[in-house]
A protein has these predicted regions:
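Positively charged
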Residues: 1-114
Length: 114
């Protein structure tokens, strides 16, 4: 199974805002993201990490899912966290995260869900 190449930092696409996308495009990108994520062994992957400028990401913690046009709308309790990133290989980075976040994203029927 051929997978997409992971974009490595400091490639500009990693810091360029992504664009909203339609469901059909999001689903196609999500398939590529899951294939690449499974091959590389991460917990999550965004479209810009495989060279796509679309607002799509996948998460594979307990039950795999993808988000189309996600937007963080609420954050709770900032923490400092050390984590890895597939776009910054072989390094652990200390970064700000939150214990909880609330996300809005487009649903399969093109409505919003939380």
């Amino acid at each position: 199974m051929e997978t997409k190449q992971i974009v490595i930092y400091p490639n500009d696409i990693l810091s360029t805002p992504t664009k909203k996308t339609d469901l059909e495009t999001a689903q196609k990108i999500a398939v590529e993201l899951f294939k690449t994520l499974n091959q590389e062994g991460g917990l999550g992957l965004s479209a810009n990490q495989i060279g796509e400028d679309k607002s799509v990401c996948v998460v594979n913690v307990t039950n795999p899912f993808f988000l189309q046009n996600p937007k963080i709308v609420k954050k709770e309790k900032e923490i400092i966290y050390k984590e890895g990133c597939l776009s910054i290989p072989d390094k652990m980075i200390t970064t700000k995260r939150y214990e909880k976040i609330w996300v809005e994203a487009d649903n399969i029927d093109d409505t919003m869900f939380f």
